[in-house]
Amino acid sequence: MEKNLTTGSVLKSILYFSLPYLLSYFLQTLYGMADLFIIGQFEDISSITAVSIGSQVMHMITVMIVGLAMGATVNIGQAIGAGNKKKAAKDIGNTVTLFMMLAIAGAAGLLFFIRPIVGMISTPQEAVSETVIYLTICFLGIPFITAYNIISSIFRGIGDSKSPMYFIAAACAINIILDYLFIGGLHMGAAGAALGTTCSQTISVMIALVVIMKKKTGISLSKNDFKIERKTINRLLKIGIPVALQDGFIQIAFIIITIIANRRGLDTAAAVGIVEKIISFLFLVPSSMLSTVSALGAQNIGAGKRERAQRILYYAVIITVGFGVMISIIIQFIAEPVVGLFTENAKVILLGSQYIRGYIFDCIFAGVHFSFSGYFCACGHSELSFIHNIIAILLVRIPGVYITAKVFSSLFPMGLATVGGSLLSVMICVIAYVWMKKKQGCMD
């Protein structure tokens, strides 16, 4: 059943919704980390690099799917908050139709251009063949990745963040088992990592479909709801496209950083790839707050409770800043052991510890602008989220990483360059928020 999150304690509502979301993100992150950890125990550095680079490409695709699905979460949430279940049903049906069409077309296109993609990201020659195999298998699984994220966005839109957690928990457990089978037992290398991930995601979707058929959501769907309606699609895309583009550009920035790292050699490429995995794990709290603020904010805005939506934003900022400060201090003392979990190569550990000691401060500032981005999406102004991220990427993040990589032998300054981009984003978000309040924001 849908959960009404427009009444009661704001903090309790955030915790009720965000904790399952946080656990979902944690489990989903274990996908990539498990692949990298397990392949590091059985294969050489070229296989590690192939999985690291390939998983970054897949992460970019996945976050763009999730970003586009944000339009569904917000629209469904606003409909639920307003008590309009007919509109919610239409939003759900059109979301399913649109996304499955995009998934099939997208998978076909990516498979066709797989070689240029691998070449474009400057994959080290030693890792090219395994990267191609890894991505081929993963691209074939895109319809299932899309299906999972559609289902999750629908559940979160109606206020249920627990069901997606159960789906991903099952998939994660299966993925780890299959990784040990395919990589450790059958010695399939990067192909085994990709196959384990794709198979487990497929099983997750099957479990989700069974749950949907049995679960009482309070929303009745008809065949007519699945017919494309331009007004409904436009509302979904108005919010979803800016978020998807934003997430895509962020991942492109990370891929450019990977290219810069790749050109410094295999050791640097492996170090940066490992740290990106660790950071993706530590970013669980900021990421969960973005989604929590957008979903809870949408319900409250739909119910006409704008001040409550603003309080949700304030609490989210406090939570993320507190977490960011704490984890930034801790990492300064344990950087080497953390990086060492993924490799025994002393040079990679040294470079990785340098990079993460600078990069980790991004947890503080990213948490703030993630929370603001969630609020902007809930208000229907996702273009603001897109704008601040693009400005930060083009003016600070990419130029900063390029310059520091050229000037310094240590990777610490390269990590700080990323932090500078987030700091600029925070400044822009605060200005935009003040402007929205003056203009009585959250208005279409």
Regions found by a protein language model. Give the residues of each.
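Short alpha-helical transmembrane segments in multi-pass integral membrane proteins
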Residues: 1-18, 76-141, 185-241, 297-362, ...
